[in-house]
Amino acid sequence: MLFFMLLLFFGCATELKVDDTIEEGFVEKVEQTEEAEPTLGIAHSENCDQTAIGSDVCNMVLYDHNEEVWELYDYEGKVILLDFSTVWCGPCQAAGHYAQPLQDEYGDNFLFVTILVEGATGDPPTKEEVDEWVSVHNITTSPVLYGDRTLLDQTGEAGYRIGGFPTYVFIDKELKIHVGAVGYNDSYIRSVIEELL
C-alpha cells in the first residue's frame, strides 16, 4: 500500500529529469499552424512566444473527449488546472479519479482539464483510450483533451517543461501561468486552487 501511495505522490518518471515544481524560466513555444485541416489531437496554438511563469499562457486549441474543439482562451475568468497525464502511467490513473470531484467541489469558477499526452503504447491516445479514461474516472463536466508530446519540452523553450507524469500547471483567472507541480498531492492542489479563487 505504501508503495502505491508513494507512486501516486511522485508520479511516473519519463526519460526527463523529475522536477518538484516548475520554476522561473518555464516557457512555452509551440509551432503554429493556421490553415491546415486539424485532425484529432492538437488543432493549433497561438501567442506562444516565451510564455514564462507569471506571463500569459499560450492559447492551446485541442480536441476534447467529445471530439469538439476546445480552446483555452475561452475560459478566461476561471482558475484552470491543466493535468498532463498518460494512459500508461499508474499514478496518472490513480490521480484521474480526483478530476471530477474537484470540478464538482470548486464549481463554475474552476476548470480541471486533463490532457492525455500518450496512450498505452507511447503514441498519442486513441479515441478508445480517451473514452475509457472518461468512463473509468466518471468524468462528466471536466474536459479530457487529446494531446501529444509536441506540447512538451524539458527546456521549456518549445513546450511545457514536463519532467514526469502527472504534471499539473495552474493558470489564474487572467490566463497567466501561476505554478506547476509533478505528482498529485491533494492538500497542495487544493491550497493552490483556493489561493487563486
Short names for language-model regions:
Residues 10-11:
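C-terminal motif of bacterial Sec signal peptides marking the signal peptidase cleavage site
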Residues 78-80, 84-88, 119, 164:
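Short pre-active-site segment immediately N-terminal to redox-active cysteine/selenocysteine motifs
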Residues 113, 129-167, 171-173:
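Short, internal strand/loop/helix patches
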